[in-house]
């Protein structure tokens, strides 16, 4: 099924609407430019982001059950010094446990969805409460701000 409306930006889809289901998809990254781990701090969300060995996510490892993948599989070189310290502490605690790829992948994805859901709901509530404005009526943060400016939404 194809969407009735969509907005494409490069190879990404920013917005999709399915009339039959009254279902709208908006790219939340167009509103919250921070990584998920930072949104957790921004909106005081208790859900932990967790760690996942993205470099280990290869077709041949999809059914892997065994020792935890090496530290390099988690991309520690891409972490901030503070995040790296936290990661190393976590890794020291789990490295001798059994790593079940499917179980860990599912857990990591569910935590991402939970964290993003809480962040965007909090973001929405802040604007609805302070500006009487629903950000999800817009496709991007700049389009919302433009509307606020021209409608002179009270500050």
State each model region's role.
Residues 1-155:
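Metal-dependent nucleotidyl/phosphoryl-transfer cores and adjacent nucleic-acid-binding surfaces
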């Amino acid at each position: 099924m194809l969407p009735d409306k969509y907005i494409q930006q490069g190879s990404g889809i920013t917005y999709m609407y399915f009339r039959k289901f009254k279902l709208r998809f908006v790219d939340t990254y167009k509103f919250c430019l921070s990584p998920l781990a930072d949104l957790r701090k921004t909106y005081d969300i208790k859900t932990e982001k967790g760690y996942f060995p993205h470099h280990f996510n290869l077709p041949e490892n999809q059914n892997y059950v065994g020792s935890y993948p090496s530290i390099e599989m988690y991309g520690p070189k891409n972490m901030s010094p503070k995040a790296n310290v936290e990661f190393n502490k976590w890794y020291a605690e789990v490295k001798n446990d059994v790593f079940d790829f499917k179980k860990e992948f599912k857990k990591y994805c569910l935590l991402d969805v939970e964290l993003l859901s809480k962040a965007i709901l909090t973001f929405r509530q802040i604007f609805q409460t302070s500006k009487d404005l629903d950000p999800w009526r817009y496709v991007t943060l700049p389009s919302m701000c433009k509307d606020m400016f021209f409608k002179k939404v009270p500050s």
